[in-house]
Amino acid sequence: MDTIARPLEAAAEAATHCLVDGGTVFCAGTGSDRALARYAADRLMLGAGPERPALPAVALSDPGDPAAPWREARALARPGDLLLALDSGDGSALAGALGVAAAGNPALVLLSYEGCPGLPPAGDDPIVIALPAAPRDQLLTLEAMALGCLCHLIEVNLFGS
């Protein structure tokens, strides 16, 4: 997990700036990643530890339409917001998220796996958190762990330990 420490830190910093400046974190995924996007949004809204203010976070998904999260992001996200896109599948979610970012709306954080089709090289724009490639069930577990770490880092940045 050392290989994802810096991208997680960069993603937490970007989300912190977004929230401090009055933005919203939009969490999106398709297929199995929908549940993890909901988890991330709920964790930011509700917290998992001591009482704290809710953070503006929204999960975008539609089980019947894999294009829905990206349509919703285009309609709702504004400059200063952040889109956290998850893809443990074939790269189609990455393509949708990159399309939203190309439209000039939110900052973009991609959480996927090494070798995912369409995953851009690691860098600052977008921020890429590339998990080690693994069987799908293990990859979803790694995504959940990475999201837990990301949300914790955001909370520490905003509220201290």
Where are the model-predicted features located?
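Glycine-rich phosphate-binding loops that contact phosphosugars or nucleotide phosphates
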Residues: 30-160
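A short, well-structured juxtamembrane/interface segment
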Residues: 1-21
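Glycine-rich phosphate/diphosphate-binding loops and the adjacent beta-loop-alpha structural elements
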Residues: 17, 23-31
